[in-house]
Amino acid sequence: MTKYDPRKNAEGYNDPTPYAAEKHMMAQIRGKQARVAGGYFENIISASCDYYLSRGLAKIEKTPEPMKPLGAKNRKGQFLACYTKQAQPDYGGTLKGGRSIYFEAKHTDDERIEQRRLTQEQQDDLEAHHKLGAIAFVLVSMSLTDFYRVPWPVWRDMAEFYGRKYMTHAELSRYEVPATAGFIKFLHGIESEVLGKEATT
């Protein structure tokens, strides 16, 4: 017979304190909210990419996330898989005239965005594209209301520019790009500089 342990539940697992249980539940809720917000952010970016393509200004696509099957397909044709390490930026493509563009997209509901939101592999890849002459940046969403295009050199050298490895809402303001419902003009400024005057009309 198993000895009774008041710290464990009927299944034999450690019973969390009410505080720990609530903390875990809140973390799950925040995680779900972040996934929903991130998905909405991606949808807005996709709509923006479609807009630029329709005007013949750029072809920019989301980089597919590579998956590794963990087993054979079942009778329904389904299989389990996991995402493999992602090194490529979230989005990449070509601007009118041939110049390449690559960027990461990061959403936050906080009042600041941290440099560590990019993995080392993602940073290395953006750096490589930047060195080869591509336009590289991080597109930041704050609460899905304010959007910023942070040039890669600024993101990379954040500690040098700001004395720390994060940027506040106020510090991001100089990189803000216009947005309307369902569309982010993340090429604002780049349009006239690289694509010509017709891009700003």
Q: Model segments located where?
A:
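Short, conserved beta-strand edge motifs with alternating hydrophobic and charged residues
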Residues: 61, 102-105, 139
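Nuclease-adjacent, charged terminal/linker segments that flank catalytic cores
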Residues: 1-28, 32, 201
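Conserved catalytic cores of phosphodiester-cleaving nucleases, focusing on short active-site segments
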Residues: 89-93, 97-110
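Mg2+/Mn2+-dependent nuclease catalytic core
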Residues: 108-132
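Acidic-basic catalytic patches of nuclease active cores, encompassing PD-(D/E)XK
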Residues: 24-82
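Nucleic-acid nuclease catalytic cores
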Residues: 127-157
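Short, basic, glycine/proline-bearing loop/turn elements
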Residues: 72-78, 104-112
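Intrinsically disordered, low-complexity terminal regions enriched in charged/polar residues
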Residues: 151-201
